[in-house]
Amino acid sequence: KLEGDICVENTLGACMFFKKKDFIDIGLFDENFFIFFSDDDLCRKIKKKNKYVIQVFESKCIHSHGISKVKNIFEKIYLREHYYLLDKFHYFHKSDNHKDMMKNIIDKKNNYLIKIFFSLITMRFKKVVYYFARYTAILKFNNFLKKLS
């Protein structure tokens, strides 16, 4: 068991504390992230500035996650999966060294269409929404990449 303060690669954004000057110096939050991966992005930017992400052993943080105003389960699944994948694409696109991983996910686009079809036939509607959300995230990210070129 580890004890004492240690340097870590990433930490949960809900538990981060910065001096205001340092937070401004790293460029604040990237507004292109919906909610996911913003903490990973902050940690990456901290390391780029030759600073450290330190986990303080004695610290305690309670993060009440999972509280959502969206009551419709299908809408909740769609929003979670769609924005999770979009944020994941954005994070890996920014980090440059994950191009192969991004390509593998984008290549799954046609597989998602097949899975949507079979999930419809078997009446697994939550899966239909799940795969549709991921499919639309891929389409949206492809449009984003086209605008950049």
Question: What are these language model-derived features?
Answer:
Residues 44, 48, 52-130:
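Active-site-adjacent helix/loop segment of glycosyltransferases
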Residues 122-149:
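Membrane-interface aromatic/basic loop that binds lipid-linked glycans or pyrophosphate carriers
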